[in-house]
Amino acid sequence: RSGTVGGNICLDTRCYWINQSETWRESIDWCHKCDCGTGADCRVIPNQNTLCVATYQADLAPVLMCLDATIHLASPQGKRSMPLCDFFKLDGMTRNILEPGEMVTHITLPEDASDWSGDYQKLRQRESWDFPEAGVAVLWKGGEGDGPSSLRVATTGLESIPSLHSEEAEDALENWSGLETVEILSESIRKAVKPVQNTWFSPSYRRKMVKVLTKRACRKLLVS
């Protein structure tokens, strides 16, 4: 079997209230994403039926976002393109801006994509093929001194969309001092993510591991 880049980017959001059999859901009531006309409440954050918080768990998006990728769409109505960061929509139901009948045709990278170095680290249940419970991509361009000239960080598996942490990366770049800055950056990314209780690991553990994953992804940066 094989997959596609577009298929990975458009991966449906996951939540253990929706990723179940019909019999299982029927036995304990439905959920906001799969209410089958019952108007069921969100099981993760009750008493609000305005937002589904199912988690986006694809691996490619954070790396491509750090590379400033452009996604290209086509439909019978025409074509359109946008930065990949603008493709996602903070809603576990819709998850992106694709219209009915529209599809991803291709993704392009800027000319300087090969100038970037980086690493991607993920938390998963098994050390094999698996969806990330948390994923962190760190990409950088080498500088003339000890630190990088450019730095980008993005995460996945923690909310309904992948996130590019531009402010945290810019702060780290402006105040670069090696290992100390990596520690500060890792903590700032940990504080920025907002996982909820809808995957295998608890939100608190996933946030703690985001800090660890960010440090791991920065290891090559410290020795490059």
Predicted regions: what is each one?
Residues R1-S224:
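C-terminal structural segment of proteins
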